[in-house]
Design a protein with these regions (language model features):
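Short amphipathic alpha-helical segments and helix-helix/interface helices
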Residues: 12-13, 90
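Asp-based, Mg2+/Mn2+-dependent phosphohydrolase catalytic module
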Residues: 20-148
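A short, Lys/Arg-enriched amphipathic alpha-helix followed by its capping loop at the start of a domain
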Residues: 14-18
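Single conserved hydrophobic/aromatic residue that forms the stacking wall/gate
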Residues: 1-11
């Protein structure tokens, strides 16, 4: 998806050093893993949760709940769902009671049915969303307080 293509390897690596990154996606396991590998994003992910194996799909909250359990997430306030699909990614995050960030590089108009917590046009804008102000000066250090 465009989310994985929107960020260079250096930024993916830096982001993975300050946040636990995981993918929640709909589709078939083999196809999605191949796509993630081809995009270069797979190397930076803690885990990948594909609807075929999860017995649920976005926007159902169950797939997000299962992913958070598998990742050992205890505090949902430190979770940010980032996605480019309002009806699946963002609605799924909303359904799961999570903060959401709509990746909207084309500045498309939001029809307003699904309201994300944040909206960004460049994935570099994620840094201030997942890091405390004092952490921004230390990009590159292992600090996994936040999870995307």
């Amino acid at each position: 998806r465009s989310v994985s293509r929107g960020l260079g390897d250096v930024y993916k690596r830096q982001l993975s050093e300050v946040a636990t990154l995981a993918v929640v996606t709909n589709g078939f396991q083999k196809v999605q893993i191949r796509r993630l590998a081809e995009s270069g994003v797979l190397n930076f992910m803690e885990d990948v949760f594909v609807s075929e194996k999860m017995d649920s799909e976005k926007p159902n909250r169950r797939i997000f709940d299962a992913a958070l359990r598998a990742l050992g997430v205890e505090n949902r306030e430190h979770v940010l769902v980032v996605g480019d699909g309002l009806s699946s990614d963002i609605q799924g995050g909303v359904n799961a009671g999570l903060d959401t960030c709509w990746y909207n590089p084309s500045h498309a108009e939001n029809p307003g049915k699904v309201v994300p917590t944040y909206e960004i046009a460049d994935l570099k804008e994620l840094y201030p969303l997942v890091m405390e102000q004092e952490e921004l000066a230390n990009v590159g250090l292992k600090n996994r307080r936040h999870q995307c």
